[in-house]
């Protein structure tokens, strides 16, 4: 999504700091340590600032439900199981995914500074929000960051109709002379959160996103939630590359779930369930170990400019680079506030009443 400043009457703008404080207030009331609550809040607010409504504050209910049900450990003993100069295997002890992810990426950054490459894999975690959050942590340090996670089964493999794969996102961020390059994508056509947005708004989904329980392409969001499945990136069949999205999803499961000794998407559970066992993969490359950082920035910026200034199709206003829309949307929302859908705002105020804190 790219916001230029206009939102319709179904949205209420909330200042970033007010939304951040609200999330921290809710989580600390439930017993989450303040430092951890701030990490979760920062992740959710960044998603909303960047226009990723599917992974923003609308996710708070999922985390609250997970905490109340006992599916999330509020005081996890996040520990290193195995470690070497350039790698580590982490056990998240069923903690909040954002906290496990943040600490894992911090460790990967440290190892990359020391050795040139840092790889940290985490198991026994929970949903960690937007993958790009962690990749950007490395880019802000002048490094290349890669982040992946598996997730509960929501996607059918090419040729199948059963939910076996997760939406299994991949993110890569790299520094440039301007804002970082940021690729942040699900390996399904869309993440499940986008369907949740359509469901709240009572809208049909675009054709090609998902199938129903019989395996037929559907635009009815309830058919997807009632036994249907999302399609892998590339869509139905192999003609437009659905098998490639399917393969990318498997890659994420191999690197995060299987390599960590955890589990793969078919056996990952929802946040509200005990032992959801989400697994993450983080990799950091210290550019200075290969070429000077300024040379890297010069070359990547030149590449981006050459792409953006190339001949455009007449139906498009401009050629975008990955992450660019998010940074422009962030500038708008930092000035005007974050637009929150009215039904989501009502849900957030219900959460506030439920836990006994001041609402929005």
UniProtKB/Swiss-Prot annotation:
Record note on quaternary structure: Homodimer.
Broad class of the protein's primary localization: cytoplasm
The cross-references to SUPFAM superfamilies, in alphabetical order and at most eight, read: L-sulfolactate dehydrogenase-like (SSF89733)
The family classification in the record reads: Belongs to the LDH2/MDH2 oxidoreductase family.
At the top level, the lineage of the source is Archaea
Q: What is this protein called?
A: Malate dehydrogenase
| Keywords for the protein's UniProt record, in alphabetical order | Cytoplasm, NAD, Oxidoreductase, Tricarboxylic acid cycle
Repeat: is it a keyword of this entry?
no
Species of origin: Pyrococcus horikoshii (strain ATCC 700860 / DSM 12428 / JCM 9974 / NBRC 100139 / OT-3)
Could you give a single Gene Ontology term from the biological process aspect?
tricarboxylic acid cycle
